């Protein structure tokens, strides 16, 4: 049976009212306050059998999902993956998403996998492209009590990962208290920093508090970076910060936002990323928002040149055993891979090579493209909720939610989020053959046209679709 036909059968299984009801019942709590699904996944992992309709439903969903999208060969590996608490959290969110939304293209998780939270707008730099217009903290930024409650709500909703950003998050005095609260819930915690405050002491402290991932911004050579960031003398501090994080063996990424001011420097930064032995080089898709001007945005041709360069670097078989992976937040990066006859889920979460497995390849249509409103949300420092940090459209405020039930109700039913999840609603990108693996950047559409369903003007294909 073809994968598309198997996916249809799987979808019918999920849409069965009895199946759907049993899936949602898995998210009730037992007498110990644990989700029933957590107990059942533990039993599934151990190969145990439980005589209950809920367990049999979960087992059927997992077995049929694996068969449809991976094949039986992956079943035993899958059980090994379940030993990882983060993988287990992610799976629980997937199952909840099936109960809420069914087998959608693109897929929507039961709660955001990732929330990017600008915990403060205090910053020691003056970057020319800052989406947050950072510098001084807002007067109404969440206090410690409000921030801790926010983490409780997100964690209890099933959010897997939280990224503390800004501003410069290290300028928030209670940051490590917030990190500890998130780690108490076994959440993945990352920090997005400009690197200038990452001295040996702070890098060691991040390690001690079990931060999983640190992303540091670097936008070019010394001259370019300091011009871009608005302060002379900070390039060396940034490089030192990167080295300190790598020395602490924390997963480290260099993030470069490509504009007309620095895109010729990008290959040099990519080479430097390898020399510094970081795990990721992340090419950020520039979006004119905050203090960022439209006139420094790349043309579609310049952006295409960079994405192809990134792809070549990722697949360069020179015999060198660098560990650096090359990623981009541009949703068209997956389309770049397909144009090179490769099935790759290329995103700002990870690069996933789907290889030659036809069933795995079909996943690209379900989980590829922009995750905005499907896999992640953003929070401003005052608790305002946005689809993405580059997408300044207020959807609500976290302080208005009493608990995780209110948050999950918002996640399920917010009109704008549901618009973003429906690629058939896209006015130009919706007619593109790559709409499921890409779909364009909704933040760029909103920035340019004040309409998040319009085309992404940064994509080289849009001129042929009008």
From Swiss-Prot:
The keyword Endoplasmic reticulum does not apply. Changing residue 372 to A: Contains only the radical SAM 4Fe-4S cluster. Contains only the 4Fe-4S cluster 3. GO terms for molecular function: 4 iron, 4 sulfur cluster binding; metal ion binding; oxidoreductase activity. Keywords: 4Fe-4S, Iron, Iron-sulfur, Lipid metabolism, Metal-binding, Oxidoreductase, S-adenosyl-L-methionine. Pathway: Membrane lipid metabolism. It catalyses: GDGT-0 + AH2 + 2 S-adenosyl-L-methionine = GMGT-0 + 2 5'-deoxyadenosine + 2 L-methionine + A + 2 H(+). It is an enzyme of class 1 (oxidoreductase). The keyword Lipid metabolism applies. Pfam families: Fer4_12, Radical_SAM, SPASM. InterPro entries: 4Fe4S-binding_SPASM_dom, Aldolase_TIM, Elp3/MiaA/NifB-like_rSAM, Radical_SAM_PqqE_MftC-like, rSAM, Sulphatase_maturase_rSAM. [4Fe-4S] cluster 1 binds at residues 123, 127, 130. Its EC number is 1.-.-.-. One of its GO terms (biological process) is heme biosynthetic process. The analysis of metagenomes from both oceans and lakes suggests that GMGTs producers are widespread in a variety of oxygen-deficient environments but absent in oxic environments. SAM-dependent enzyme that synthesizes glycerol monoalkyl glycerol tetraethers (GMGTs), which are thought to contribute to increased cell membrane rigidity at high temperature. Catalyzes the formation of a C(sp(3))-C(sp(3)) linkage between the two isoprenoid chains of glycerol dialkyl glycerol tetraethers (GDGTs), leading to the formation of GMGTs. Belongs to the radical SAM superfamily. Contains four domains, including an N-terminal domain comprised of six helices, a conserved radical SAM domain (RS-domain), a bridging region with two helices and a beta-hairpin motif, and a C-terminal SPASM domain. This is GMGT synthase. The gene is gms.
């Amino acid at each position: 049976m073809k994968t598309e036909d198997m996916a249809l059968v799987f979808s019918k299984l999920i849409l069965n009212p009895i199946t759907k009801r049993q899936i949602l019942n898995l998210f009730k709590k037992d007498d110990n306050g644990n989700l029933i699904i957590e107990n059942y996944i533990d039993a599934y992992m151990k190969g145990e059998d439980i005589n209950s309709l809920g367990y049999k439903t979960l087992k059927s969903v997992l077995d049929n999902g694996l068969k449809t999208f991976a094949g039986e060969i992956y079943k035993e590996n899958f059980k090994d993956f379940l030993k990882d608490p983060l993988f287990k959290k992610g799976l629980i969110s997937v199952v909840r998403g099936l109960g809420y939304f069914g087998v959608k293209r693109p897929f929507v998780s039961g709660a955001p996998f990732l929330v990017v939270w600008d915990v403060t707008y205090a910053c020691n730099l003056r970057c020319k492209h800052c989406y947050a217009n950072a510098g001084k903290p807002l007067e109404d930024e969440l206090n410690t009590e409000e921030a801790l409650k926010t983490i409780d709500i997100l964690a209890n909703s099933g959010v897997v990962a939280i990224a503390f950003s800004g501003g410069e998050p290290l300028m928030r005095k209670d940051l490590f208290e917030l990190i500890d609260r998130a780690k108490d819930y076994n959440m993945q915690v990352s920090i997005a920093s400009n690197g200038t405050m990452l001295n040996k002491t702070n890098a060691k402290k991040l390690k001690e508090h079990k931060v999983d991932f640190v992303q540091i911004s670097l936008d070019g050579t010394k001259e370019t970076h300091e011009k871009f960031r608005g302060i002379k003398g900070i390039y060396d501090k940034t490089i030192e910060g990167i080295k300190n994080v790598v020395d602490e063996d924390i997963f480290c990424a260099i993030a470069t936002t490509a504009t007309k001011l620095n895109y010729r420097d990008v290959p040099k930064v990519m080479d430097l990323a390898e020399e510094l032995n970081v795990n990721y080089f992340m090419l950020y898709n520039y979006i004119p928002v905050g203090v960022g001007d439209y006139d420094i945005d790349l043309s579609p041709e310049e952006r295409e040149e960079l994405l192809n360069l990134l792809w070549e670097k990722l697949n360069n078989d020179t015999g060198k055993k660098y560990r650096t992976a090359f990623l981009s937040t541009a949703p068209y990066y997956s389309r770049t891979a397909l144009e090179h006859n490769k099935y790759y889920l290329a995103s700002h979460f990870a690069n996933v090579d789907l290889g030659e497995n036809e069933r795995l390849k079909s996943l690209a249509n379900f989980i590829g493209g922009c995750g905005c409103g499907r896999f992640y949300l953003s929070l401003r420092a005052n608790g305002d909720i946005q689809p993405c940090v580059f997408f300044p459209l207020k959807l609500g405020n976290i302080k208005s939610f009493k608990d995780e039930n209110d948050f999950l109700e918002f996640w399920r039913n917010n009109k704008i989020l549901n618009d973003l999840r429906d690629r058939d609603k896209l006015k130009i990108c919706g007619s593109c053959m790559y709409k499921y693996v890409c779909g364009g950047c909704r933040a760029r559409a909103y920035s340019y046209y004040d309409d998040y369903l319009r085309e992404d003007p940064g994509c080289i294909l849009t001129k042929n679709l009008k």
